[in-house]
């Protein structure tokens, strides 16, 4: 891309509302940034139909033994990794199901490796390395919408039949042309020109949260609005698990604790045990037949 083309991108444009930010006092600086940030949720709202399509892709992939894979360089890569690594403790999903890949590898998370983003081959090879298949959904994240690393990854993903999603912050972006689903969330110029770690990153973080969370809900890992598949790995999470069980079953603290421990610290199993007055094995069998959905498991027992 020529310099003139780069400057034409919305994400590289100067923001007329913050031209005086360098001369502003500290509170005014914060107010200017906050006023720009308030535009992010509105921009995300406009692309929800496209996010729904991406969610459908990811749900179908995971339901059929595939994966949801995020790729990005710099801030975009960090966002994907952050969303992916939070899913196992929150929803007890295998780390292999939702995967975050960052250009430059794990070390690039804390030490910038900006030059790697210029290689299409690197994007392809990172997918080859994880043995990408046609069952997977690949989400390429790039605020500019023209990062070579993402272009290479999406081209390779399409070539083997994987579903592809492009997440950018510019209209008619290059990666949008390559993907089965294009999400172009237009947040406008940044408060600091070109600093896409600000509004663009906030928008992408919101969308990635929505994407993974919506898929996990559809997988039965949320009941009402409770994280019933939380991985109980410390005291705080054990207390949270007990509270969740109490919310659903109205059990006493002692009864919820006893049942949780009898259920091998599996919240869903404990809930079904209490709601159906069955043992651990029966509760697990009911959940397996219901594909992990608590309400369906209880209905199966009642019928």
From Swiss-Prot:
InterPro entries assigned to the protein according to its UniProt record, in alphabetical order: Etherase_MurQ, Glucokinase_regulatory_CS, MURQ/GCKR, SIS_dom, SIS_dom_sf
Catalysis performed (reactions): N-acetyl-D-muramate 6-phosphate + H2O = N-acetyl-D-glucosamine 6-phosphate + (R)-lactate
Keyword Lyase annotated: yes
Family matches, as Gene3D superfamilies: 1.10.8.1080, Glucose-6-phosphate isomerase like protein, domain 1
SUPFAM superfamilies according to UniProt: SIS domain
Stretches assigned to the SIS domain: 58-221
More about this protein: A lyase-type mechanism (elimination/hydration) is suggested for the cleavage of the lactyl ether bond of MurNAc 6-phosphate, with the formation of an alpha,beta-unsaturated aldehyde intermediate with (E)-stereochemistry, followed by the syn addition of water to give product.
Full protein name: N-acetylmuramic acid 6-phosphate etherase
Organism: Bacillus pumilus (strain SAFR-032)
Organism taxonomic ancestry: Bacteria, Bacillati, Bacillota, Bacilli, Bacillales
Gene: murQ
